[in-house]
UniProtKB/Swiss-Prot annotation:
This is Deoxyguanosinetriphosphate triphosphohydrolase-like protein. Residues 1-33 are annotated as: Disordered. It comes from Rhodopseudomonas palustris (strain BisB5). NCBIfam families: dGTP_triPase, PRK01286.1-1, PRK01286.1-3. GO terms for molecular function: dGTPase activity. The keyword Transport does not apply. Belongs to the dGTPase family. Type 2 subfamily. Gene3D superfamilies: Hypothetical protein af1432. Transmembrane segments: none annotated. The lineage of its organism: Bacteria, Pseudomonadati, Pseudomonadota, Alphaproteobacteria, Hyphomicrobiales.
Amino acid sequence: MSVGMAAPRAAYGCDPDRSRGRQFAEPPSNNRSAFRRDCDRVIHSNAFRRLKHKTQVFVFHEGDHYRTRLTHSLEVAQIARAIARQLGLDEDLTETLALAHDLGHPPFGHAGERALDACLRAHGGFDHNAQTLRVLTALEHRYPEFDGLNLTWETLEGVVKHNGPLTDRAGRPLPRYAERGVPIGIVEFSQRFDLELWSFASLEAQVAAIADDIAYDAHDIDDGLRAGLFRVDDLRAVPLTASIIDGIARRYPALDESRRGAELVRELISHLIGAVTAETMRRLGEAAPRSAEEVRHASSAMVAFPIETAAAEAEIKAFLWTHMYRANRVMAVMRDAEAIVADLFQRYCDHPADLPPDWLPTDGPVAECEADRLRRIRNFIAGMTDRYALTEHQRLFDSTPDLR
């Protein structure tokens, strides 16, 4: 099937006309499906706009062409829609989940998340998926009737469960949450609006999750090449990318390094999309789910790479870990970024009146209990852009690292 050709809506995909609804009842739109409305609400949210100035790997002022959380999310959405189109899934729901998946990330990428997690270790830590849920259900203030965006059940369950179930049917955390438990924010929300934490998410959510992996692999290669952290030929260390590079050399023997890198990224994305689509079709053929509910109640995920492609994808991640994420240049900046977030957290804890007026409790900081104060500080810092975090640090401290 052509990548650009949409398959008929499949029985195993989510149908907006059969949505489980929203936490707060709203009349339907005359010209948009429930999932299209969700997508539009995400795009128009303040949190989505802030992704423009949140780090993917390189801090915001290192160059105009490196990815940010915003450009990454747009690229994930494009890949996810391409896969969803071939599988006959709801493209609007898939796009919504792709665009929303990073809304809970704090400034400075994973460095900021590590710092916030360490600061909150005695209080449950920090989880960006739980923070995304807070953004979507509480922290956006755009509507007179409710806090949050009041998105459909299908969108919220996809945000929370795109990587798989969180608990067993008895509510016990699965192994990945065994040490620290399922984030309390997710548990408490699910008690109010049951997200069935024990089941798999929809195919649309599973597609958005694997599209995130594809985008990370391909586009971090692109950014790493642009930054000079490695060259195209260094990627011959990975058999999959080596075979793509060899094919490019045969077809375009005189191609310059920049175009070789761009062609490598393009062909890698195409290869991974084709592989995951074929494997998912195979799994769907074997399981023959007749509805989205049967997908949720399956014994394993249905969207996946074939075994050999999964191994190749792991090799790409290992290459990037060594040559990019752990590169001295990147690590030095990320250590400073962690320190900035930790400094801000401690400062607001010690001097809560330093928070902006609209982030102070109405009764004043003195009247607030510690747990509420920590939640407020967490939400404030998690919503910062890289640029704003630096500006706040410069306002509150005598010396601020130069993240260059």
